[in-house]
Amino acid sequence: MIGGDYMDILFKTDDFVFSYRVGGILIHEGKILLQRPKNDNYAIIGGHVAAMETSMETLKREFEEEIHAKIEVDNLFAIGEIYFPWGKRPCHQISLYYNVHLVDDNIPLDGVFHGYDELDNERIDLDFCWVPLEDLKKGT
C-alpha cells in the first residue's frame, strides 16, 4: 500500500453502486475454499480493493482478516464483470480473480469453519467451506 489507510473503491449513488473487488481461488486436494454468509450464496474469498492498495495486497489482507491465514498470490486467473442488486440499487462490479496458495496451514483443510467480515461497519458472520470441484461442475 502506498502509505496510510484509504477507503474501499466502492461508490454509492442514489441510482447505483460501483464496486472493485478481488478474489482468491484457493484449491486443496480437489476442493475450493468458498465463503458463505448465513442464508446466502457461496462466494470466492476476497473483498473490496482500497484506494492506493494493489489487488494482491488486498487479497493478502482479506485472507488474514477473515480466516487468519497467510497466502501468496499466484497468477491472475480471470476478470469478471457482474451486475446484481445491492439492496434496492443495482451494482456494477469489476472483479479480479487470482490463484492463491497457503503459506501456513493454520486453518482446517477440510469441512466447514467459521469466520467473519465487516462491511459498512457491520459484522457479517461467514461459513468457510471446502467444496469439491466436482460439485461445482455439477452445479450443486
Model-derived features: positions:
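Conserved beta-strand residues within beta-sheet cores
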Residues: R21-G23, K70-V73
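C-terminal lobe/hinge of AMP-binding adenylation domains
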Residues: P37-D40
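Unchanged
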Residues: V49-E72, Y83-G139
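A short gly/proline-enriched turn/hairpin at secondary-structure junctions
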Residues: A43-G46
